[in-house]
Design a protein with these regions (language model features):
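Short linear Ser/Thr-Pro motifs
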Residues: 10-12, 31, 98
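A local structural micro-motif
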Residues: 26-27, 193
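Flexible, glycine-rich phosphate/dinucleotide-binding loops
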Residues: 15, 35-37, 117
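N-terminal beta1-alpha1 ligand-phosphate binding loop
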Residues: 2-24
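Anionic-ligand binding patches
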Residues: 2-6, 42-198
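A short beta-strand-loop structural module common to alpha/beta enzyme folds
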Residues: 27-36
Length: 198
């Protein structure tokens, strides 16, 4: 698996940490794709679409490498939240999600342009928040950095105290569904070996 270079098309520190956690060797090349979450497709299709766009934008100049693209969104009843642009948007998101159960959806694309191979999938996790108040929202935004996180919160930081329960992959909520990724990553390598007659 180590003979082909891997590129993560994301500068997310959480994705980098998670991929290192499973021993993956990779470089980082941030995609310049700007997501538009107003497309008239389902939330799952939306996450997959932008993951593919990110991976493909990097694979154009890296055909011999495996490029990994990902996009995480928060969905509540087809209200889709990406990363907040500012403090007001962050507060608005957190107010909306208080006391509710929402979905965290991550789309992933694993692209090997040299052989026109691509594995795409998405992972969903249901997250239920307890009720929290305005003061707690303000304090969270003051102490943490929610502006690079879908839905404006990190389950791995101090906001964990407001998480009542989750149903599904924890790592997906952090930003990358490790187990599902590794399954597809291994299968892609198997397909490459079979194509090369190994």
């Amino acid at each position: 698996m180590s003979q082909i270079q891997n590129i993560l098309a994301s500068s997310s520190p959480r994705r980098k940490t998670l991929l290192k956690q499973i021993g993956l060797v990779f470089s980082v090349e941030k995609s310049t794709i700007i997501e538009d979450y107003n497309l008239k497709i389902s939330p799952s299709q939306l996450a997959i679409f932008w993951a593919r766009e990110k991976a493909r934008s990097i694979s154009v100049n890296n055909a011999n490498s495996i490029v990994i693209g990902a996009d995480t969104i928060v969905n509540y009843d087809n209200h889709v939240f990406g990363k907040p642009k500012n403090k007001n948007e962050s507060m608005k998101m957190l107010r909306f999600l208080s006391g509710k159960t929402h979905q965290v959806i991550t789309g992933v694309s694993i692209n090997y342009k040299k052989l026109d191979m691509e594995h795409i999938f998405h992972s969903k996790t249901r997250v239920t928040f307890r009720n929290y108040n305005e003061e707690e929202i303000i304090e969270y935004i003051k102490v943490e950095t929610p502006f690079d996180k879908a839905g404006s919160y990190g389950i791995q930081d101090s906001f964990a105290k407001h998480v009542k329960c989750i149903n599904g992959c924890y790592y997906n909520v952090v930003g990358f569904p490790l187990s599902s990724f590794f399954y597809h990553f291994k299968n892609l390598h198997k397909e490459i070996k079979e194509h090369n007659g190994c």
